[in-house]
Structures are given as C-alpha cells and as structure tokens.
Design a protein with these regions (language model features):
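Short acidic-hydrophobic, aromatic-tinged amphipathic segments that line or gate anion-handling sites
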Residues: 26-27, 88-91, 181
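Catalytic core of membrane glycerolipid acyltransferases/transacylases, capturing the structured
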Residues: 33-94
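A transmembrane-helix-recognition feature enriched in membrane-embedded lipid enzymes
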Residues: 1-28, 52, 60, 75-85
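Non-catalytic C-terminal accessory region of glycerolipid acyltransferases
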Residues: 4-5, 96-237
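Short, structurally constrained coil/turn elements
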Residues: 18-20, 34, 60, 108, ...
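Glycine-rich, highly charged phosphate/nucleotide-binding loops
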Residues: 23-27, 93-99
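Short, flexible loop segments at the rims of nucleotide/cofactor-binding pockets, characterized by
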Residues: 15-21, 89-93, 123
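Short amphipathic alpha-helix with an adjacent loop that forms part of the alpha/beta core around
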Residues: 28-33, 104
Length: 237
C-alpha cells in the first residue's frame, strides 16, 4: 500500500498535539508487531481516539488502518483523508463489504484498528463487545492486541463541547500483550477474554492517570466522576 497521505497527516496531527500541549503516557509499544497483520482492539471514549492510538503506535513504525463509520468517509474534508490513509469504511446497515476489506488488509500484513464496542460510551466504561474483531482475527489468522486509551474524551467526545485550548491534558494509551485465536475457538469466550484484557488495561491507565477523577464529567461514577452509568448510557443510544 502506497502511503502518500498518511505521513503529512501525521505531521499535521503532531502539530495539533503540540499546540494543545498534550502530555503523553504511551505504554506497551513493544506489543505492537514490527511486521505482519494484527487486530488492535481498544475502548472508545472520544472522537480523537483513533488519532491518538495511531500516534502511540508510530514508534513501532506501523500505520494502523482504522475501521470507522461511513459518515466520516462521506464528509467532504475527512473523506478523502480517510481513504488516502487506507482506513476502512463501516456501513452499519451492511457490514459485509467492510469485513472483507479488513480481512484483505490483514492478510496483506496490515494492522487494523477496531473499536469493538461500536460506538463511544457516555459512561466512559467499556460496554459489551461486538464479535467482528474476533471473527476478523480468526479469519485472517492474526493476533489480537488489546489496548486502552484515556483522557481523549476531555478534548472531544459525544454530547460535550470540544475543548481545543492549550489545556495540557494527560493522554494515556496502553497496548497489551498480543494473543492468538484459532479457527473453531468459541467466539463468545474469546470476546469475554478480550474484554477482560481491555478492562485490566483501562484500570491500569486510570489508576496511573495524573489528574483527579473526582467530580469530573469525563470520569465514570466508579472513579468518583459524574458521568452517567453504563446502563443509562445504553438507554441513550
């Protein structure tokens, strides 16, 4: 895959991060393979998660091809950029084409990034996972890499006003150890294992997050924040 668009976009994104004064804590980069296909599965708390996780993976010299909703590809500005970076459009009404495109990318040795919850959660907790990520890894014969991102919701997320000031927010991204799945494995059992790994990573980045969660809109009630519960979040979809 010729990457003519990805490099200049990275330069622009890094310039934005510098302008915002973001303070990064990236962990587990050694778990991102230098070659070969893999599925990276991460939680979804903010609209910039894909760009931040992509930035965190750069030391491994890999470009992640993210699966993202079709509406982003339909936009006159973001659409050409997304296609130029070889991200994968997901049509929620008919996912067959996107599944095949992701499978093809994985078999070519690409890393595909997926938000297995399918949407951002207003609770900032990890919801139930959809099975597509596990099925992709099984079909392509590639490992799954769990990941967690935290802090991005403070910049831009659902139902909140974007905050692009120089706030110097801490941003945490952690990649867990890759694990393999085999064709014939119980999909639900693998999903449960993946979710558990993601929860452990998220708990770790939250525990080490330098800013207090107490009383903050961007933090779940479990950590003393004022975000709605996971159950309430499901009812608001």
């Amino acid at each position: 895959v010729a990457d003519l668009v990805y490099p200049p976009v990275i330069v622009a994104i890094k310039t934005l991060w510098k302008y915002l004064g973001l303070r990064f804590d990236f962990q587990g980069i050694e778990n991102v393979p230098k070659t070969g296909g893999a599925v990276i599965c991460m939680n979804h708390v903010g609209y910039l998660d894909f760009a931040l996780v992509g930035t965190a993976a750069l030391p491994a010299h890999r470009y992640i091809r993210f699966m993202a909703k079709r509406e982003i590809f339909d936009h006159k500005i973001s659409g050409p950029l997304m296609r130029g970076m070889h991200h994968i459009s997901v049509d929620r009404d008919s996912g067959t084409g996107s599944f095949v495109a992701a499978l093809r990318a994985l078999r070519k040795g690409e890393i595909v990034g997926i938000f297995p919850e399918g949407t951002t959660s207003l609770s900032f907790e990890i919801d139930e996972l959809k099975s597509g990520a596990v099925r992709l890894a099984m079909g392509a014969g590639v490992p799954i890499i769990p990941a967690a991102v935290w802090g991005s919701q403070r910049i831009m997320t659902k139902k909140q006003k974007p905050n692009f000031g120089r706030n110097k927010f801490p941003i945490s991204v952690s990649f867990g150890e890759p694990f393999t799945v085999a064709k014939g494995d119980d999909v639900e059992a693998v999903e449960a294992d993946l979710k558990n790994r993601m929860l452990k990573l998220l708990d770790s980045v939250q525990s080490n997050y330098p800013d207090s969660h107490t009383g903050q809109w961007w933090a779940p009630a479990r950590l003393g924040g004022t975000a709605i519960t996971l159950e309430e979040s499901r009812n608001q979809r």
